[in-house]
Amino acid sequence: MSELNDLTTLPLPVRFERVARRDRRRRLVLVGSALVVALLVGAVGAWHPLLSAASRQSATIYGPSASSLDPAVQSDAGSAQVVSQLFESLTGIDSAARVQPALASSWDTTNGGKKVVFHLRSGLVFSDGSALKASDVVNSWMRVLSPTSPSQLASLLDGVVGARAYRDGSGPKSAVGIRATSDTDVEVDMSAAASDFPAIVSSPTLAVVPSGLDSNPKYLRAGSFVGSGAYVVSADNSSETTLTANKRYWAGTPAIDTIHLVSSPGANGIVDEFQAGNLDYTPISSGDATWIAYDKVLGPSLRLEPSPSIEYYGFNTTKAPFNDVHVRRAFAAGIDWSRVVALQSAPGVVSATGMVPAGVPNHGSGDFGPVFDLATAKSELAAAGFPGGSGFPAVTMITSGGDNGQLEGAIIHQLHDNLGIDITFRAEDWTTYNDQLLSNPPAFWEMDWVADYPGANDFLGLLLGTGQPNNFGRWSDATFDGAISEALSSTDAAAVQKAFDQAQSIVKDQAPVIPISYGSGYALAAKGLLGALPNSQGLVRYAGLSWASGS
């Protein structure tokens, strides 16, 4: 066992403060070892017709419990997996990253791309039989923008005229460019040409809820649940949520009538529970995937799917020492991040070449990842006033998730050996960690992000734009913002790519974050379970699941 793998032998003044870690992420994968929530059988997933029902009418799936069933409130992947089953968006994304109609049967783009009109399917109803109208869509999206309690993912609508000003409290609701022009038409005015807006509205955050939800919270409760998706909540407790097929679902009644979502893996762990036949589908860690791939019994049940996700480390750029670009550059260049990534030792995990994962439109061909260069790192550290690490202040790296601190240990080792810097490490539960990121970001932190929609801006502007809710390091750069604006407003493909490349170059130079790896998802699926095909958001729709005949 190498020194980096055995944290008990660290010859450094390293203090590991252990707090219970749980699987988490935003549109996120689980940490470190790239344990992937994105492969849970999710919603709005692979886009294909409903499959014929077989003799089996239920399935049991393991995954994190939802922190909220409200699309406008949820922001983590575990919640999105469940919410997407219960509430439908106007569009969906298939496994080839193509936008497909969902509640909207079609849409038109006019005024040079600045106006988008969505046409709802005729006869749409919620699960209780009440009519689903364009006004419900408008209400759902305005809830996301509410200035008193905006969604953590409200920035998805920033391209809409007046949307950002309204959620920031600096503009009136009446100025927001979202309106129902009839019971079936939703008209949206964009600040600039926005060819990606139909893809953006596929996000679970922008799913449609009944207009009376705020005054009738019972709509989110088991037994009285009212939704627009393929399933409704019929029972709920601390360890299991039961979903029942919505017989009024626009695409037809799902083939599997009952889905049991369990959030407690049992005393034996999820792999043993799956092997015992107690689970039909479960995500697994990359560590488990490496041995299961060679197991004669479990191997045939293993699923590996690319996931548009990135793991990155970031800094609080508003406070010393990381408000100094020289310090950030020293951390980026002073660590051999490829060695850190190699510790994950899992198929499908590769070093990042920038913030935009491979396979996402406008990923680009350039390499915008960190470059290991000790001479540069030492020079930058000296320029910041810390030659050889002398006088560097106390810093605690804080993360959350399910690994054992192996990656953090490697980072701490290299900072000590390469730059003479000693830092401490603490792991927190996801709720505490998320709250801290939003209110008082740690000096040095880690995040894994999975796309809300398949677009470069979901990994750039939404994560690093000035004032964005998910810009946890509070970084601000006018040139970066300008490049993003250019990318989003241009109708010329080459100009769009050039602008996104410029934005990535700025991130590489200024190092507000350090992209380290792109990940893949791993899961075990029972024999005969069909349709568990993730889309490019890492989600699979329960409505597309079925058991093969004879299962």
Locate each region found by the language model:
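Extracellular/periplasmic solute-recognition and catalytic clefts
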Residues: 234-244, 260-319, 342
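N-terminal lobe/hinge region of extracytoplasmic solute-binding protein
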Residues: 62-111, 142, 224-227
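Long beta-strand-rich cores associated with HINT superfamily self-processing modules
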Residues: 523-551
